[in-house]
Amino acid sequence: MALVDKHKVKRQRLDRICEGIRPQIMNGPLHPRPLVALLDGRDCTVEMPILKDLATVAFCDAQSTQEIHEKVLNEAVGAMMYHTITLTREDLEKFKALRVIVRIGSGYDNVDIKAAGELGIAVCNIPSAAVEETADSTVCHILNLYRRNTWLYQALREGTRVQSVEQIREVASGAARIRGETLGLIGFGRTGQAVAVRAKAFGFSVIFYDPYLQDGIERSLGVQRVYTLQDLLYQSDCVSLHCNLNEHNHHLINDFTIKQMRQGAFLVNAARGGLVDEKALAQALKEGRIRGAALDVHESEPFSFAQGPLKDAPNLICTPHTAWYSEQASLEMREAAATEIRRAITGRIPESLRNCVNKEFFVTSAPWSVIDQQAIHPELNGATYRYPPGIVGVAPGGLPPAMEGIIPGGIPVTHNLPTVAHPSQAPSPNQPTKHGDNREHPNEQ
């Protein structure tokens, strides 16, 4: 009996676990703090206060996927990105620990969401991002085409004398009345609806085509719905695009569809550059089939008038993918993206994510499977980080000491502020959470 007592090990109380000793991580080494990286930017001042108690935040400022640092490829659990780089399957396979990508914006055509899902990487967006700004910019482009303010300004800058009625008629040739014109919207999501409300105030008759939208919305907004793209093109004096880009609508506006438009119609695109065949558009502008076009997005970005099919196209207004931008919109988008990353760290992927766009492709990877309930006591709820290849148990008394994340070529990011534990109300691994899915239909522009 004495021999048994000699080798008998007293079970440690659960509340003593946190006293300088961390629970063992299952299936992998201990990772003190997950790494979250901003891939194509360098300003983390908005994101860091939201994530500083959970993760080390760093940036790459990459202009291409080849510039993403090896440390990020090997260690980053979460990534945030704008629209300036593209992640293909080959690029996604280079990430060793990545579990969630948040696109700071509404469009996600620059990420292979199917490949990401198959690799166990959730992709999220901010569907409400910059709706007001994009709608305002779209209406500005429409008004500019009708009232020709840009061309009138250029004429004065070039020294054109405008005094007599004949001179006014010559320099303002092409200006048209707005009231009574028909504006056709392709895609009637958040931005499309915001444009419709604004356009009606200027006297437009608004019609829209959106095969994904349920019936009834047209009645509440006082607009007319058409059920084929051909009908919309045939009836519209001005066509504006408000749909996401996918494999089904690439070059939606091409030589064939342009010929279905009214002679001398206008075209506006502040959605995605790939929706318009720029070669066909340039030819239509030169021939006068399209009276004028305004583009905020382009097939190849950054856009330059010095090259590409549109360099010699007349009656064309181009802006550098800035329709979405305002200080307020940028702040809101970044806060929403960081908050989504926080949900991913503290909850389950993809169940805890509010705006995951690739759930149908998502495959739960083995290292991130449901935690054995015997491994985590209920008192530690909210203090467990799901970090591959295992689980990091964090004491309720606090997180590990602050770490410094340095990405060569960027500014060192140091966390000196005291850290605190997760809120106790954070969802446990097997606790169901409510989430919203913004993919009711693809036309959320």
From Swiss-Prot:
Active site, renumbered:
R272, E301, H321 (proton donor)
Residues of the region (Disordered) are 414-445
Q: Which residues bind NAD(+)?
A: 106, 186-191, 210, 243-249, 270-272, 296, 321-324
Q: How is it modified after translation?
A: Phosphorylation by HIPK2 on Ser-428 induces proteasomal degradation.
Chief localisation class = nucleus
**Family statement:** Belongs to the D-isomer specific 2-hydroxyacid dehydrogenase family.
Recorded protein name is C-terminal-binding protein 2
Identify the species of origin: Mus musculus
